[in-house]
Amino acid sequence: MCDGRDEMRRAGKSGRARGGNSRAGAGRLAACAACACLGWCAAGPATAQSHPATQPAVDRERTFRAARHAEAFLRSLAPKIDPVRLRAEHRMKGKKFYVEYLSAWREICLVGGESERRVIRAFLAPIVARTDTDAYHNLADSSDEEFKQDVISYLNACVLHGEFGFDTTRYRREIARIVPRILAPAHLDRRGIDNTMAIVYRLRQLGYEGGPGYCELFRRPGCVVRMHPDLTQLDLDNPLAKQPVYDMTHEIFYLTEFGRTPLQCASEKDLRYVRRMHASLLPIFIRKRDIDAMAELVMDLNYLKMADLPEYATACEFLVTHQNEDGSWGDREHIGNMAKAILQVNPNYLLDVGQYLHTTGVTLSALCYPLYASAAGPATRPSAVR
């Protein structure tokens, strides 16, 4: 979800802020993290879900052109992507936006050739170098609030550094210092379900055990995928009230490990609910021109191997044809309405970084994933650990 929720709360908006892990799974994730080549994501066949996956109706050439166009927008942001300065000077979650920036480039790398990857890595090198400071590696001594805001992004950035082939020796040493604090009840008890899943997932990518398993988290009150609320009845024009939609998308990200496994811990009833909700929500967000939410729902369908839904093809077509002139994604009117509330409480907020960057990144992921992910195998029933 685009950032700005804290600012919108202060502006008086109402709403809510946004064990199935086997040793074998942890080993697989650690092996992925250890690989310094961006090709690892497509290195093995994805396991199919109960619904047959069809090759998405996304025009490859248009998607490639859109990714190339997005490079112009990402390059224009380069001077602003300094996580320490974003927090100090703009009151923004600098590590979060740094990760969103690297993640967007990662998608472009994964659909490009080796020569393009080398060029992008060289471009990113001086930006990555901005993080080799004590001010960036500050979480061992940070306040509880800053720690809570930054730790998931901090772990994710280390994984991304490794994937791009940057040295992570110091980074891993700094992470080792804070793992006990990450796993302490004083921290984990303050996290929501999807955030805790994210922490467990990233720690396993970095070779650490600990924390609750996915299925323990799945059984907790409030898990959207298990509780089956009707998300279409939310006030979907209110960025905070629609937060359960993002809770669902993020639960699916981690329960599928971004498409690497079937939906863990879930029953066929849960899968039917997820399929129905995505089919119902996508047309709503298309009408509202809410590209950010739309892209995350498409990402889910990619990971769930549910690209046979007609709403999937419609949403992909909308995304590929609604790129902004500067290469970004995000409806100007939709983001402009949110910006009014955000800028009232934080005049230093950078809209291009805080809003358009996230939407651009998730749209790239939604469109590019089918181009680099392996073809799905025969449809099989997912493992349902109840």
Report each predicted region and the residues it spans.
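N-terminal secretory signal peptides that target proteins for export/translocation
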Residues: 1-24
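Extended, basic/acidic-rich, low-complexity regulatory helices/tails in eukaryotic proteins
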Residues: 55-58, 88-89
